[in-house]
Each structure stands twice: as C-alpha cells, then as structure tokens.
Amino acid sequence: MIRVLVIDDSLFIRTVVQDMLSDDPDIQIVGVASDGLEALDKIRELKPDLITLDIEMPRLDGLSMLERKKEIDRFPKTLVLSSLTSEGAEMTKRAIALGADDFMLKPRGIKNIREIGGELKHKIKNICTIAYITAKPVLKDSNARNVVLIGSSAGGPPMLDTIVSKLPSDLNAAVIITQHMPKGGFTAALAARLNRISPLQIRETENGDVLKNGTVLVSRAGFHTIISSVLDKGGSQSGKIILTDSPPVHNVKPAVDKTFISAAQVFGNHCVTAILSGMGNDGGEGTEAIKKAGGVTIVCREEDCLVYGMARSALSRNCVDHVLSLQAIPEKIVETIRAMNG
C-alpha cells in the first residue's frame, strides 16, 4: 500500500486528486495540506511514502519546501503537479533539480480529469518502485548508424520510465523520444527526470545535435524534430537534428510523424519504432514510412495503454511488425538493434 499526502492550496485540486486515487486498492490517501508549512508538519506526523506537491502556495511554496527536505529523515517521494504555463514549466524544472521525482500537469477542469487519472496512478506506482542510476559509464563518442524512435502522448511518460530504465548503456543506437507536451520547458524537465533512471545519457534536443550511440534525445516542445543526413569524418552516414518551427501536425508540435518520416529517409532499414499510449492519429503515417523503408515497427498492446488512439492509427495501416506488452518492448528493441549490427 502506497501512503499519499496531497499538498495543494486549491480545494478543487485536493478534492480531484483524492477522487482520482480513491478507487485504487494499492494507494491510500493519509492526509491533505494546503501549504508547505502544514505539509512539513504532516510529513513528520503521517510519514507518507509519497506526496503530490503544488508549487505555488501561501506561507511556504513547494520549491522552498523542497529546499528544506533535509530537515526530515526519509523525505517522501515527490510528484509535482504543475500548472500549464511557462512559469509553471520553469518552476517544475527547478523542482526536479531540487530532487522532485516526477511531475505532471494539473487537471484543467472536469473534462480533463478522466484523461489524467490513470496516468497519475501509474506515476505514483512507478515513482515508488523505480531505481535511480547514480553513475553512468563514459561512452565512446561514436555516431549512430541505427536509431530507435519512440512516440507517445497522454499516458506516455510512465511508459517511458519503463523503457529507458531497461535499455542498456552500450546500446548501439541513438534514441529519440517524441512525447506530446506543451512548450515552455516541460520536455526539458522530462529529459532531466528520465536521465536519473536510465543508464543512457538523456537530454532535450538542441538544433544541430548529431545522433550518438547510447544517447537519448527528447524532442523539444514547440518545435518539430527533423532528422537530416550528416557524414562523419570517415564518410559514413549518420543523422543530425533540425528543429523546425513549422505549423503543427495533428494539432501538435512536436509531431511523431514528422520525426519518423524524416528518420525513414535517412536511416531506412536501420530504424526501430515504438508507439505507446496517446490519443489521436499522430504516428500512424510515420510508422508506415518506417515500415516501407524496411525498418522494424512496434506498438504497445492496448491493455497497457491509457489511450489507444496513436497505436490504433498505426495498426489500421497494416504496417506494424510487433504488438507487445510494455515490459517486452525494451527487450525487443535491444534484440532488433543487435540483429541490425550483425
């Protein structure tokens, strides 16, 4: 049983979070607090396993509270609930730097609650079970000949935890994650958090990045991540990141399709794709492009996804090689990359 303390100055958010978690037999709400000072007292008293934490609160805000976490023996795991603003994104990045374990966007209203309830439960359980990587090997600086492409939206972040934590540090490929998120810094915070739990080096994309083996790039929100061809000193082809501010595709930016289609043109049959949870049709056309180029295509099975729109779009095009459980996807990725390298 995971014991949770809900911390938020909004009665609406406190009530919503309690309602979303109340039907899960593995989670118990042990209390609520409306500001950081009250929360510190309740952490000492109730000893929760995890707190959901608002940042902007009276008396003592969430960041100041995290700065005081050393005052408490065995400070609980921390899930930040962030507002959908550029300021909220910046404060979320600071919270991750101060030791928060994960974050997610607050529900915008009643219609949004069902969409995020499942993700909230997944995140809480992931946070309490996943291990941090404290030291990473120094990798040989080698341009990637193979690329792994992962696309996800609603419900995707907890699934990304599972995948990146199980990929080996010597993966002979670059990895690009395209996760639908609002711009303003949320994808940087996602990359920083994933970097803690993976043996691979993970960061947000920068314009001009050359794809390297053993590295994971998270597509920067507000731009499409395009892969173009680049030659290394030995004349071998690899890929380079171009961030473009072209119009949204499927009403999102970054779009999975833009990344997948460009990768197919550069890496051809040296691509592996995986579509995870997400609503809408993004990723279907891109998966088809990878399949036509000779790459290997994967979608997660429906029972492991919060929303099955993106995976269903790919399946409807008859271009999917493997429908797998979430737990089986990392193993299949590694197996496929090894086969590509002979």
From Swiss-Prot:
Species assigned in the record: Methanospirillum hungatei JF-1 (strain ATCC 27890 / DSM 864 / NBRC 100397 / JF-1)
Biological classification of the source: Archaea, Methanobacteriati, Methanobacteriota, Stenosarchaea group, Methanomicrobia
Protein name: Protein-glutamate methylesterase/protein-glutamine glutaminase 1
Signal peptide: none
Family: Belongs to the CheB family.
Chief localisation class: cytoplasm
UniProt domain Response regulatory: residue ranges: 3-121
Active site: 153, 180, 282
GO biological process, one term: chemotaxis
Protein's job: Involved in chemotaxis. Part of a chemotaxis signal transduction system that modulates chemotaxis in response to various stimuli. Catalyzes the demethylation of specific methylglutamate residues introduced into the chemoreceptors (methyl-accepting chemotaxis proteins or MCP) by CheR. Also mediates the irreversible deamidation of specific glutamine residues to glutamic acid.
Domain of life: Archaea
Keywords for this protein: Chemotaxis, Cytoplasm, Hydrolase, Phosphoprotein
Enzyme class (EC, first level): hydrolase
